[in-house]
Amino acid sequence: LNRANPVRSLSLCDNSAAITAIANDLDYSSIFAQQLKLLGKQGDLLIVISASGNSDNLLKAVGMASELGMESYSLTGFDGGKLKQLTVGRNIHVETPKGAYGLVEDAHLAICHVITECIRSVK
């Protein structure tokens, strides 16, 4: 919190009221895309994390980010699914057997820590 150059960031998973309202009024697959439509802007960065790479809510979020002029990066597991294809060149993929959620989640956690330290070292 004492950093001279803080990084603006937010989690689209944290607002349970928004998630519930969007899922109820539209559908669950739109919970992130609709938030991005309101909050995202050109030049922003979207990072999505998925074991399978096939979650409709994340695929729609990447589509919305593209419409808004945002860049999308993904962390995927198993075979990477559709997210790996949508974010070619902007994907960190952990190849694991399908169903090995623990391995993927642990690897993604470690990768997120590395990314955080890289951002801190630049700022």
Walk through the language-model features, giving the residues of each:
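Glycine-rich phosphate-binding loops that contact phosphosugars or nucleotide phosphates
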Residues: 1-123
